Amino acid sequence: MACCDERRTPALVRPGHRWSRGEVLHWLENDLPDDTLVGFDMSMSFAFDDAKAYFPGWTEGPSGARALWALVETVCADEPHLGATTFADHPQAAPHFRRHGGREGALFGGGRGRFRQTEHAQARAGCRPYSNFNLVGAAQVGKGSLAGMRLLHRLQHRFAIWRSHAAEISASAA
């Protein structure tokens, strides 16, 4: 992790330290300077617009980002280190993921999987994005996203998280 302000280049918070997810969460909850813009290198939700649902067919599935984060946290509550393997193996969620061992769920969408609007924009720009429903290989982006959703669920009352809190004003934001 690094911090910077308008006068300096980024500086590591604890140079040489290997942060655990729990340590990152603790620092963000307790030591984050006021009026800070926080950036995360992860996706904050899954594809929704294409099917008007994160998990089509899951009648009690989440209908928005905060509900998604809460669901991931609830299903994975017993996993240490903000892990999220339990969610990918959940009977209602598993059909939507490509998982290790050649297990591609029937609702993964084939190819590179279902895309959010941002992946569609990347493809139009000439990039080769992959779905965050992909949990295997070098192109997997979903594992970090799921862990990040647990982090966001726990931080949502600490500061505003764009876009799900777009209209709210806070001293800090992510």
Task: Name each model feature, range by range.
Residues 1-174:
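RNase H-like (RuvC/DEDD) metal-dependent nuclease/polynucleotide-processing core
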